[in-house]
A protein has these predicted regions:
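Short beta-strand element of the alpha/beta-hydrolase
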Residues: 41-50, 145
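Conserved alpha/beta-hydrolase
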Residues: 91-111
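Alpha/beta-hydrolase fold nucleophile elbow
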Residues: 139-151
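N-terminal cap/lid segment of alpha/beta-hydrolase-fold proteins
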Residues: 2-40, 44
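Serine-hydrolase catalytic-loop signature spanning alpha/beta hydrolases and amidase-signature enzymes
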Residues: 40, 50-56, 101, 133
Length: 151
């Protein structure tokens, strides 16, 4: 299935849903990108993996969510939680502080086509291509940090 890129301004952020990122073999992965409203250059925090960028943390991982809220009750402070996803830093907390948040569905997962091949050389190359893409965008200052629990 093909997904169309959609951009909008919502909740004080520029959000691009299903951002295409072309890999070295021509396959296009899909990402969601959350940016500050200003036209500056910002550092990027990226997550990448098979956990489906469109799956809410609270809905898709109920037991982990419950344990997190019990252990760290302030998790929701300053957030509506509507953009929270597994392994993604909360855009509502980081974007206002001047970061771009990028969440990429890996090959064959979520909104990205292809066949999942976890921890393979192909997946490593895809991740590399995504990092390089993020570091060279007009809104990026070239610094790309990675976030994840298992990825």
């Amino acid at each position: 299935m093909s997904y169309r890129e959609v951009s909008e301004i919502r909740d004080g952020m520029r959000i691009t849903w299903h951002q295409p990122i072309e890999m070295d073999d021509g396959l296009v992965l899909r990402a969601d990108v959350f940016r500050p409203l200003g036209n500056g250059k910002y550092p990027v925090i990226m997550t990448y993996g098979p956990y489906a960028k469109g799956l809410d943390f609270e809905e898709g991982y109920k037991s982990q969510w419950t344990r997190l809220i019990q252990a760290v009750p302030d998790t929701l402070k300053g957030s509506s939680n509507k953009y929270q996803n597994w392994e993604l830093v909360d855009p509502e907390k980081w974007v206002p502080d001047g970061y771009v948040i990028v969440r990429v569905d890996s090959r064959g997962a979520g909104r990205s086509p292809g066949v999942i091949d976890v921890w393979s050389p192909r997946e490593a190359r895809d991740f590399y291509d995504c990092i390089e893409w993020a570091g060279t965008q007009a809104w990026s200052n070239g610094k790309v940090g990675l976030n994840g629990i298992s990825y």
